[in-house]
A protein has these predicted regions:
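Ubiquitin-like/PB1-type beta-grasp interaction modules and other compact soluble beta-rich domains
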Residues: 1-64
């Protein structure tokens, strides 16, 4: 399926947000995800399905000072 992630079209095989985070090689504890303009709590990622054309914004948290 094709998703729009941070403004770019990407083909993915993930069926849920959790699977997408894993497929993209991200650490779940360091990202926040907005799906179709709604922030999805991390505990809902495993049961949040993805559909062709969904728009996601993924924000990475970086530590430092």
């Amino acid at each position: 399926m094709e998703l729009i992630i941070n403004g770019e079209k990407r083909a993915v095989t993930a069926a849920t947000l959790s699977q997408l985070v894993e497929q993209l090689g991200m650490k779940a504890d360091r990202v926040a995800i907005e799906l179709n303009r709604e922030i999805v709590p991390r505990d809902r990622w495993p049961q949040t399905p993805l559909k062709d054309g969904d728009q996601l914004e993924i924000v990475h948290f970086v530590g430092g000072g």
